[in-house]
A protein has these predicted regions:
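Short, flexible active-site loop motifs that bind/organize anionic cofactors or intermediates
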Residues: 8, 41, 61
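Sec-dependent signal peptide recognition
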Residues: 1-7
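Short hydrophobic beta-strand that contains or immediately precedes a catalytic carboxylate
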Residues: 61-66, 79-82
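A short, well-structured juxtamembrane/interface segment
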Residues: 40-54
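Residue-level preference for short coil/turn positions at secondary-structure junctions
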Residues: 56-58, 99-100
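Rhodanese-like catalytic fold shared by cysteine-dependent sulfurtransferases
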Residues: 16-43, 72-76, 80-81, 87-166
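Hydrophobic h-region of N-terminal signal peptides that target proteins for export
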Residues: 7-17
């Protein structure tokens, strides 16, 4: 009897799995956005040569969504840093401007070096994935992604570091 009562209380007081209590978080919406973006993303993947050529076009923004520290330690020449954790409608508008502007993205997992500042992340959690989904979700659909693994020591990459002020 006591077991039945405890089980009934646990069931009655457990939150429903699908129920979102926070009206500012929409996990189901994020899952749908991810499904919607999946096929679109497949057509937006670039080789290094395509990425580099696209990066030379007027108005094209090379967006590095890694942390400010990682960006300062090294990034592709011409890239602009807006850390993924700082993505908001306002910060994206300031950094990108026009929602039709061509955007190129890359992340740690595009580099074979696997050392600071581009330690390889878990492949399912590669920053490119979240960055792509979020940019499209915020209305910046003209985004393309580097889909090649390169060595940042290769001169063609144009890897630069930001000098640390002393």
């Amino acid at each position: 009897m006591l077991r039945t009562l405890v089980a009934a209380l646990l069931i009655a007081t457990a939150p429903a799995e699908a129920e979102d209590r926070n009206p500012l978080i929409d996990y189901a919406g994020f899952q749908q956005l991810t499904r919607d973006v999946s096929a679109y993303r497949q057509g937006r993947l670039l080789s290094w040569n395509e990425f580099e050529k696209a990066g030379r076009q007027p108005r094209t923004l090379i967006l590095d969504a890694r942390s400010a520290d990682a960006f300062a330690a090294g990034h592709i020449k011409g890239a602009v840093n807006l850390p993924f954790t700082d993505f908001t409608a306002a910060s994206l508008a300031r950094a990108i401007g026009d929602k039709d502007r061509p955007i190129l993205i890359y992340c740690n997992n595009n580099f074979s070096n696997n050392k600071a500042p581009v330690e390889t992340k878990a492949i399912r959690l590669a920053l490119n994935i979240q960055t792509f989904i979020n940019l499209v979700g915020y209305g910046y659909a003209n985004v393309r992604e580097l889909n090649e693994v390169v060595d940042f020591n290769d001169p063609k990459i144009g890897w630069v570091t930001t000098p640390v002020a002393t």
